[in-house]
């Protein structure tokens, strides 16, 4: 089975992300969760914090590794000797953007395939953006994220 790269910002990782990683772990020998650093984005959590939270949320999965990256995804996939990019599709609205990304990645790295998974129904409405919003207003996010994420966001918002 090929190695798969699951890229994302993961600001923060949610149970929806973890569900996709768990399911991909049954399909592929090795999953590399690639936490993106994009200087054009202003994430709530820095790259190290995001990587650490992904590690904690996926610690129960023996075939998952976590690394940060800041270069072109097609180049990163090649550096990792992977042949598949995993992406999640929550709704039809995600499809057009993901389709464009897959086409561009195919142009840049023709040997790499993109695979799309949909989340479990009970997780399809969860997004990192919503989690940050709820947490910033003091809401309970524990149902939607790993306990380490709940703790990290509570701490982050109590500092501000």
UniProtKB/Swiss-Prot annotation:
Location relative to the cell: Cytoplasm
| Residues spanning the membrane | none
Query: What broad class of enzyme is this?
Result: transferase
Pfam families, sorted: CTP_transf_like
InterPro entries tied to this protein: Cyt_trans-like, PPAT, Rossmann-like_a/b/a_fold
Q: Which UniProt keywords apply?
A: ATP-binding, Coenzyme A biosynthesis, Cytoplasm, Magnesium, Nucleotide-binding, Nucleotidyltransferase, Transferase
Entry keyword Cytoplasm: yes
Q: Which domain of life is it from?
A: Bacteria
Entry cofactors: Mg(2+)
**Main location per UniProt?**
cytoplasm
Q: What is its EC number?
A: 2.7.7.3
- Entry keyword annotation includes Magnesium: yes
Pathway assignment: Cofactor biosynthesis; coenzyme A biosynthesis; CoA from (R)-pantothenate: step 4/5
Catalytic activity entry = (R)-4'-phosphopantetheine + ATP + H(+) = 3'-dephospho-CoA + diphosphate
Any one biological process term the GO annotation gives: coenzyme A biosynthetic process
Example GO CC term: the record gives: cytoplasm
Q: Where does substrate bind?
A: 9, 41, 73, 87
The UniProt record gives the binding positions of ATP as 9-10, 17, 88-90, 98, 123-129
The terms under GO molecular function for this entry are: ATP binding; pantetheine-phosphate adenylyltransferase activity
Where along the sequence does the record put site: Transition state stabilizer? 17
Q: How does it assemble?
A: Homohexamer.
Q: What does this protein do?
A: Reversibly transfers an adenylyl group from ATP to 4'-phosphopantetheine, yielding dephospho-CoA (dPCoA) and pyrophosphate.
Which PANTHER family does the UniProt entry name for this protein? PHOSPHOPANTETHEINE ADENYLYLTRANSFERASE (PTHR21342:SF1)
Under HAMAP family, the record lists:
PPAT_bact
- What protein family is recorded? Belongs to the bacterial CoaD family.
Q: What is the protein named? A: Phosphopantetheine adenylyltransferase
Q: Which organism is it from?
A: Marinobacter nauticus (strain ATCC 700491 / DSM 11845 / VT8) (Marinobacter aquaeolei)
